[in-house]
Amino acid sequence: MSLLQSLLHLTNFKSPLLRTLVPAVSAAYAIQAAFALPSIFAQNERFYDFSGSLTYLSVTALSLYLPALRAKYTPTVANASTSLPSLLAPFTSPGGMGALNWRQVVLSGAVIFWAVRLGSYLFQRILEEGKDSRFDEIKKSPARFAGAFFAQATWVSLCLMPVIALNAVPASAFAALPAFKASDALGLLVYVAGFAFEITADRQKSRWLRERREKAHDEQFMTSGLWSVSQYPNYFGEISLWTGIATAAAGTLVSQPIQVALGLSGGVTGPLTVMALSYVSPAFVSFLLLKVSGVPLSEKKYDKRYGDRKDYQEWKKNTPKLFPKIF
């Protein structure tokens, strides 16, 4: 029996949800541990954000293909000739035996697009700047630095909960659902809007920083573009896109046939469970950005630098912290 078959056998729980959830979360912590060891030894944070993006990509792909891998390699049903399902099949010939559902492909793709875009942006930024000031003190302590990687594995796992749960649904269960639901449209619309907002904010900030390095302006803090309507427009975009993913996933997971297929109990427990699995993602992102590592760290830094400046005080007073000022 190969190592892969052994791992599949070890995680072959009765519950379809656990059969996908446990290996996916375990993979997140394993990947982070693999990057943590050399980073701690070298006291170097250069690959921290890159490892986060790679973990998102790997865990998403694993959760999407895990049912097919089980069908291919589990000893009781092993069939080496079984090929992995096509990502295009849900759109060209939906409903095939063992085929993925279009919702699984689209939401997994949404995560992958986001992870590639943000990961490349952050990796390019640290290559240009040479370091990440967040880790100036943390990387000196092996325990604290290891904790940062552990926290990142937790971040990935919680953010991906709605996608992991959706990808755990057996293919046959989707036949009981309509081809398209209002929650699909709403969730994808919120995701696209949030993704566009985050991209625009990051590009505006990158251009502003580049122009400042080139002496095109002497502004000390950014108040133009999306920063004129929100103090943290990139965070607003990120919270929004994860809310969109959660909404689209929850609209499917809350259906009774899907809950039965996942092995969840009836009554109110099933809907509450899938709603919690879905919305823990944007809830955790909001908590992390607004209360832990995002806004508090940035605000402390900028208040210390510019807190005595009248223009900075006016900008903080007149600009919403998160939700954009539309009018």
What positions do the PLM features span?
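Short, hydrophobic transmembrane alpha-helix segments
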Residues: N12-S15, A36-R46
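Short membrane-interface loop/juxtamembrane segments of multi-pass integral membrane proteins
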Residues: D132-P142
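Membrane-interface helix/loop boundary segments of multi-pass membrane proteins
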Residues: R207-L209
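Active-site neighborhood of divalent metal-dependent phosphoester bond hydrolases
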Residues: W114-K131
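Loop-to-helix transition at the N-terminal end of transmembrane alpha-helices
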Residues: E45-T60
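Select subsegments of transmembrane alpha-helices in polytopic membrane proteins
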Residues: R144-V156, Q231-E238
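Hydrophobic transmembrane alpha-helices
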Residues: S2-Q32, Y56-P67, A71-L118, C159-Q204, ...
